[in-house]
């Protein structure tokens, strides 16, 4: 079975400080995982390496079996690999669906484009409705 996300031999140093070394990680689709450890253990660095915010010194990041190591963070987002930060907030004045539409729009590269075609808007809304249903979120 293809893993949703894998790292193979991932390593990153900042000067003489080796933050990650030979990290092998396999994450199954739909499973929940926790990355825990003390401050300074390299958790954020590992997430930044996987998301493309940092380039590894060695190793690979695989998304559904495809090597995305050389892709920018923006390209990884378009392929479905994105990260959230510890402090994340929804737009409180928007509905659940409207919040999901913003996220889907960003991933599809359709955000904040007033001149995009109507069918692209419909595609974004349709996908957002599906995601909202999968997550069993009610609108308010």
What spans do the regions from the language model cover?
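Short coil-to-beta microelement around the adenine-binding A-loop and adjacent beta1/P-loop entry
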Residues: 17-18, 75
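Short beta-strand immediately N-terminal to the Walker A/P-loop
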Residues: 33-34, 83
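The feature captures the beta-strand-to-loop junction immediately N-terminal to the Walker
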Residues: 36-38
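Helix-to-loop junction immediately C-terminal to a conserved catalytic motif
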Residues: 51
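ABC ATPase NBD Q-loop/coupling interface
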Residues: 60-79, 115-121
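Short coil-to-helix segment of the ABC ATPase nucleotide-binding domain corresponding to the Q-loop/switch region
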Residues: 94-110
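Conserved ABC ATPase "signature" region
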Residues: 112-140
């Amino acid at each position: 079975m293809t893993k949703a996300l894998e790292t193979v031999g991932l390593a990153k140093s900042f000067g003489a400080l080796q933050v990650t070394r030979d990290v092998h990680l396999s994450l199954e689709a739909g499973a929940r995982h926790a990355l825990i450890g003390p401050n300074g253990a390299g958790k954020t660095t590992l997430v930044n390496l996987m998301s493309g915010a940092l380039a590894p010194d060695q190793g690979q990041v695989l998304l559904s079996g495809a090597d995305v190591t050389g892709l920018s963070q923006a390209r990884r987002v378009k392929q479905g690999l994105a990260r959230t930060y510890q402090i994340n907030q929804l737009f409180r004045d928007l509905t659940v669906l409207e919040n999901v539409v913003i996220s889907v729009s960003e991933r599809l590269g359709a955000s904040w484009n007033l001149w995009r075609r109507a069918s692209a808007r419909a595609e974004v809304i349709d996908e957002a409705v599906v995601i909202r249903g999968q997550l069993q979120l009610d609108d308010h």
